[in-house]
Amino acid sequence: MLASRIGEIRTITLEDGSRVTLDTNSVVEVRFDGERRLVQLERGRARFEVAHDARRPFVVAAGPGEVVAHGTVFDVDLRRSGILVVLLQGSVEVRRPAAGGKSAASTMLRPGQQLAISAGSAAAPVAIRAPETRWPSGMLSFEDAPLVDVLASANRYSRTQIVIRDPAVGERRFTGTFKADEPVQLAEMIGPMFGLRIEHDQNDNLILAAGK
C-alpha cells in the first residue's frame, strides 16, 4: 500500500520503472505478477508514467472502471461520482463494466483527451484544459470554474478549510493560479476578487462572508 498525507504530493518509482505521483491524501495498492501490472487506486488522484512492457499490460483499477496502458502518461482521479481519466501522452483504453453480464464497454483516448465515467455510464471524451494537469507541481489552476469547485479542490490539501456560507457566491466564476497548500493566501486572493471578508471559526477555518 502506498499513500500520501494531507498536503503531500509524493512520487514513487515502481519495480518495473514506472512512476506514480500521488496527489494529496491518496492511496494506491500495487500488485504485479507475470501476466499484468495492476494498481488499485483506493482514494484520491494519481499520475502514472508507465514503463513499456509488451508482455504485461499496466492496469489501473478505480471505482467503476479501469484503465489499460502500455507506455504512456495519464491521470486518474477517483471521485464520489466516479472517475476522471486524463491522457497526457500515448494511448489508453478505458473500460467500464456492462450490465446484464455483457462484455465490458471500452473507450480509447488520444493525448489531450479526458473521460469521466460513473457506474454504468460514461460521457464522450472531451479535450482537457491544460491548467488541470499542473497539480504535480503543487500549483492549482482554474479557468472560469465555479468558486465552490475551486475551494473543494483546494480544501483537499490542508486541514484548514475555506468555507463559503452563501451558495450564490459559490456559483461565481474563478480564473487564477495558486499554491495548493496555502489556504490563507488563497482566501486573501479570493476575498478582494468577490468583495468578501475573511473570518475565522473556532476550528481556525477560514470563512468567506459577504462584505459590509
How would you name each of these model-derived features?
Residues 14, 33, 98, 118, ...:
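Acidic surface patches and DE-rich sequence motifs
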Residues 25, 114, 159:
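ATP/adenylate-binding site constellation spanning eukaryotic-like Ser/Thr protein kinases
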Residues 4-9, 52-56, 87-89, 110-111, ...:
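A short, compositionally biased
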Residues 59-62, 67-68, 75-156:
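Short, polar/charged, low-complexity connector loops/linkers at domain or secondary-structure junctions
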Residues 1-77, 81-84, 141:
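Juxtamembrane extracytoplasmic segments of single-/few-pass membrane proteins
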Residues 121-212:
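N-terminal export/assembly leaders
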